[in-house]
Amino acid sequence: MAKLTVKDVELKGKKVLVRVDFNVPIKDGVITNDNRITAALPTIKYILEQGGRAVLFSHLGRVKEEADKAGKSLAPVAKALSEKLGQDVVFPGTTRGAELEAAINELKDGEILLVENTRFEDIDGKKESKNDPELGKYWASLGDGIFVNDAFGTAHRAHASNVGISANVEKAVAGFLLENEIAYIQEAVEAPERPFVAILGGSKVSDKIGVIENLLSKADKVIIGGGMAYTFLKAQGYEIGTSLVEDDKLDLAKELLEKAAGKLILPLDHKVANAFAGYTEVKETADQNIPAGFMGLDVASKTIADYNTQLEGAKTVVWNGPVGVFENPDFQAGTVGLMEAIVKQPGVKSIIGGGDSAAAAINLGYAEKFSWISTGGGASMELLEGKVLPGLAALTEK
């Protein structure tokens, strides 16, 4: 990576500002999934071990007005982080002011403080989300000239707590998580070991147009599954019953199929039901057509067998988006079959691009078998599109 990393700077005795992604799900004051906290630990521990004084910034959810603050405080996160680190985490419960400044100035080497939810600054004029220059400058002034960005999940956004701080410090560097995310995803797309197979699921073609176009020029094959497959199949003249379809994207689907010249792989059969919820009949289709009154909710046995054929010998696999409604046991066989086909390839570098695919791998017990699971859905999508991430671009060059 052509940017400075946390290992390139002297940290001892310095107040080090760190942007982490602690945007975790919280229900009734309890964190229900702490993966993002765990993912930030290597960078935090390194800073503390080097004698740095860590000042952490993170957002949590969306905050538009005063009433939104309820349930959006980072207090439960401070408690969880303290337990994971085995040391106190100072939490002044504010985003600015004399109390915060005093608490930061009182930190000793190896101590840590968490600033309150950065999006509390969005209540008055969206200062965080719109990268208000004064806010970025103020937050930068709380440290000693070093900013570590370890929040890959927000790297595709230009906010005061990443791009704003970066612009006002001597050195803005990448943390270990950000460095790994970029290394795995960008290198897989830009310099893959071949054969390189990309797998795209999810419901809408419109969400993935840029990704499909970029990957068609980079990958050896692009497997399409999930709801967006039905738009491609309808564009080819197949019957799709009551399946999800974007009729306004049929011409685009035809264009992409022509451009792909055989690189786009679509389902050969489907698992269908007579309703999305409350269905009374589930069956497999004989081919790519779906009968009237039925909707496709997963791929079926011929497609799963084809996944094994298409992925045979693959050395790089990037997967973004499930191929069925995996949350329902009736429609998870396709996603399970796909994961089986990926992880059994010898020496394969297998990468999941965050979001629902990551949830599928974790919930269905496959997470440990993949080379890398991204922590950022939106950011990984933009990398797969070949876009420049503002949070990364703002870091200091090596």
Curated annotation (Swiss-Prot):
Q: In which pathway does it act?
A: Carbohydrate degradation; glycolysis; pyruvate from D-glyceraldehyde 3-phosphate: step 2/5
Residues annotated for substrate binding in this entry: 21-23, 36, 59-62, 119, 157
Under the heading SUPFAM superfamilies, the entry gives: Phosphoglycerate kinase
* Reactions catalysed according to its record: (2R)-3-phosphoglycerate + ATP = (2R)-3-phospho-glyceroyl phosphate + ADP
Which InterPro entries does the protein's record reference?
Phosphoglycerate_kinase (IPR001576), Phosphoglycerate_kinase_CS (IPR015911), Phosphoglycerate_kinase_N (IPR015824), Phosphoglycerate_kinase_sf (IPR036043)
Q: In which broad location class does this protein mainly occur, judging by the first location in its UniProt entry?
A: cytoplasm
| Listed EC numbers | 2.7.2.3
Subcellular location as annotated: Cytoplasm
GO terms for CC?
cytosol
What EC class is this?
A: transferase
Provide the coiled-coil residue spans.
none
Q: Which of UniProt's keywords are assigned here?
A: ATP-binding, Cytoplasm, Glycolysis, Kinase, Nucleotide-binding, Transferase
Could you tell me the superkingdom of the organism this chain comes from? Bacteria
Q: Which molecular function terms from Gene Ontology are attached?
A: ADP binding; ATP binding; phosphoglycerate kinase activity
**Listed Pfam families:** PGK
Q: Which HAMAP family match?
A: Phosphoglyc_kinase (MF_00145)
What quaternary structure, including any partners, is listed in this protein's UniProt entry? Answer: Monomer.
Q: Which family does it belong to?
A: Belongs to the phosphoglycerate kinase family.
- What name does the UniProt record give this protein? Phosphoglycerate kinase
Organism classification: Bacteria, Bacillati, Bacillota, Bacilli, Lactobacillales
